[in-house]
C-alpha cells in the first residue's frame, strides 16, 4: 500500500488519499462460499476519477488474493455508478457471475462480477448511501483544494 500511495501521490499527483481499515463485513461470499476478508483501503481523486487502492490484511480466499496470484499488483476492478439492481441484471444477462459480494455495515449491498475474460478484471456494483456520496464529495473537494504536496495521506477521520 505504501509504495502504491507514493506512486499515485508523488508521480501522478492524485490525492490526497484517505486511508481506513475495513473490518470483516457481514455476509461475504467468494465464489459461492462464505469468507471473511479484511481490507486496508485508500480513496483519492485524480480530476473526476475516484481511485481506490486496496490491500487485504488477512489470509482469506477472495477476489483480491485471486488477482494477486493471477497477475500480481495492479488493476483489479472498476465500479459502475448505476442502480445496483439494474447492474446486477445487466451483467448477469451477459453471463458474468458474482465472484464476491457482501453488505456494508450501513446495509448497502456490493458485488464484484467476474469479467476477467472480457476486460482483465472485475466490475463492482454498490448501493451508495447518501452518507457515502457525501464522503466522496468531500474527498473530491479536498482533491480540488490540494496543493499536490502537503499531507498526501490522511485519515478518514479528517473528512469530518
Identify the residue ranges that each predicted region occupies.
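Glyoxalase I/VOC metalloenzyme domain signal
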Residues: 1-18, 31-97, 114-160
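Generic detection of short hydrophobic beta-strand segments and adjacent strand-loop junctions
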Residues: 20-22
